[in-house]
Amino acid sequence: VMDIPRPRWHRLPADFVGCTLINNGGYVVTKNEQKNSAEKKDSENMHAEPVNEVHSSLYQKVIVPKKEVNKQPPSKSRIKKPAVSSENDESKGNKSIQSEKPKQAFHTKHKAPKQPAPAKQKQSGIAKSKKLNQCQKSKRTNGKKKPSIKAYFLGGLNEIGKNFTLFECEGDMIIVDCGMAFPTDDMLGVDLVIPDFTFVEKNIDKIRGILLTHGHEDHIGAIPYLLKKVNLPVYGTPLTLGLVEGKLKEHGLFGKVKLNVVHPGESIKLGCMKIEFIHVNHSIPDAVGLAIYSPAGIIVHTGDFKIDCTPAQGEMIDLGKFAELGNKGVLALFADSTNAERPGYTATEGKVNASFERLFKRAENSRIIIATFASNISRVQQIINCAVKYGRKVALSGRSMLNVMGIGVEMGYLDVPDGVLIDLDLINRYPKEKIVLVTTGSQGEPMSALTRMAFADHRKVEVGPGDFIIISARPIPGNEKTVGTVIDELMKRGCEVVYESMYEVHVSGHACQEELKLMQGITKPKYFIPVHGEQKHLRKHAGLAYSMGKDASNVFIGDIGDALELNQDYMKKLPSVPAGRVLVDGLGVGDVGSIVLRDRKHLAEDGLIVVVCTIAAGDGHIVSGPDVVSRGFVYVRESEPLMDEAKRLVNLVLENCAENNIHDWSTLKS
């Protein structure tokens, strides 16, 4: 029996027993039962499970039988009966096949062959192609359109954050993730950015639920704002819903929304779609990918993922499930593109743990302050483990850090021995070398705990010589300048600062190029759609698909507002739908738009001059004033001649208006 090299996720047909090498270099297949009918073979080729591209030529060589095999004509019982003449019966038959195997490309009835199968097996590829075209034509004449699934991209494309996607099939819709984004530097006074929910509100009767892949802000941050407009059931893993629950309490929605806990490996039914949750590795526990089983075919959404063989918490990503889906036939793969520019593999979380061990030894006489993402529970667990090992107490700083860690401890995702965690107010009662402070601010956020420490604005923590600061995070694109400013300020105060580019104190939670190619290789999708990234990330990810042989017509690089329709025959772009961004400023949601931002920018750049004057309504003479008030324009005490000249000009204009009997307020302003 020939030992065929293949990846372990690759599967040969169920009736394959082995193969024997013969003199001319070919292989003879041993099967439980040979299927030699030409018609049957065509049908099998149409419905065969996809084969891994690396071994496809070898696989085809193995399954093609030689002349010497199967000299006997096929059994009549293995031949499909001719299609019934009744039009209704034929349509019913097609419908039955669709319900059993919705992912298959062709569903047609075949007449019984008049000749034995071996005589038909020599037909050329052109003849087979003609036969397939006839099948397609037959299908079209049935008058029934193949089921399709639509995807609406309302966020997460050409940007980092604000992930928000809708899928629709046969009148049923589901939402995948509902995240927020951080404001850019030109969004003055804006707290956060959320998706535009107009399209959701218009289709509320079709939407069956919200599916969350994990608990990061760019995937759950906008949930409260959406649920204030529409009441929908939410599905997610325990930690993800624990974080959502905290947000609902802040917004007064707790108890008004149905939260449904699911676990990896479980499935739910929403309308015509079945959704299976698949365990993946990420920088937060309880992250999942999604397999969406629809009448049109299987959609795989990876969520945020990487392949980590030694994760800090939990198990390795369930590659077996993704491979199983690939063997069933995946219509489309929607995959994380964040690290598509980075070659190789993402480093394992175990490397960070080893770095912490070395740095704790190096800073044995210093107070250690570590800034990381509040949601990175596994990273905090590693810090706590090192603190326990080296006899240090742990304190937390930052509102989000306290909230997330509280949820983590309550739900059992954090293991903190008794007596290790202390209140921030008590840190000065212990020697510096006995303290580890875990804080927010790894992205240089203006009001974060680490930023306030750097600018001596923190009420409880004062940093200086003797402090060893570790920034255990990589700057999000766009935050490099603010992070650099914080590092500079800390160093000016005498702190020793360690960050990612000089030490392995952070690893990404997103897959790099080789992992992304592996995901495409085992899922073997018909269509590929890169998501979760800026334009450069999406295009680089698409380039990886091209390098693996994917045709450009089967790859879609989208933008916010795009709509896409997919089925077994085609992928086409639909007219755009309402989408965009909504700015949140304090309690105001959507009050700030482009015009307000433009005015704020002008005020910030040019300053403000206001003229205050009281004018009599009757004859228009000046009752009091004018007073000229300036903010951000010039320093008044050093510019008194300029301000006096401004008052003189205002008086002159008002006197001219009074002489010409102009009392209209709008005219005076102009």
Language-model-detected regions and their locations in the chain:
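His/Asp/Glu-rich metal-coordinating catalytic cores
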Residues: 125, 129-211, 216-430, 448-462, ...
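Generic low-polarity alpha-helical segments
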Residues: 16, 150-151, 522
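Hard-cation-handling environments
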Residues: 342-472, 476-525, 529-669
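Acidic, Ala/Val/Gly-enriched low-complexity intrinsically disordered segments
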Residues: 1-3, 14-17, 28
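Intrinsically disordered, low-complexity RNA-associated tracts
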Residues: 21-143
